[in-house]
């Protein structure tokens, strides 16, 4: 049968109440321990989705990558796949990820990167933590309203026209 473990370590991975998901706060030792469970198996997939603490500043990148590298080291030869993405807040971070993965694999740590051509598993909606309108000034002005009130406001042709003239702030 199939076996795998995936961890989400992103500030976008939060519960509906805004709390971080449990794995996003896991330490290297815990993730390496989970990865060690694959020891002796002929199969198994390990994956990590991380923003490398980008919203907290670029200086956090190395420490976050170290956590994932420790996980890969504990995986007994099973490669750790890391999602590679480019975000507006640090557009060249993908280069840092590739450089670290190359150094790790040169030392025998099995790491890979994968690129999603589109957002997979992203739930969008006005009640979700992330949606296409959240960075626009017009939407931000009504964000505090109930869902029904927001839907009514957004149905107004004048609101639509105004929103279409705006530029969203960077939200991811």
Q: Language-model segments: which ranges?
A:
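Polyanionic/metal-chelating signatures
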Residues: 20, 38, 65, 69-78, ...
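Hydrophobic, small-residue-rich alpha-helical packing segments that form membrane-like cores
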Residues: 2-66, 70-71
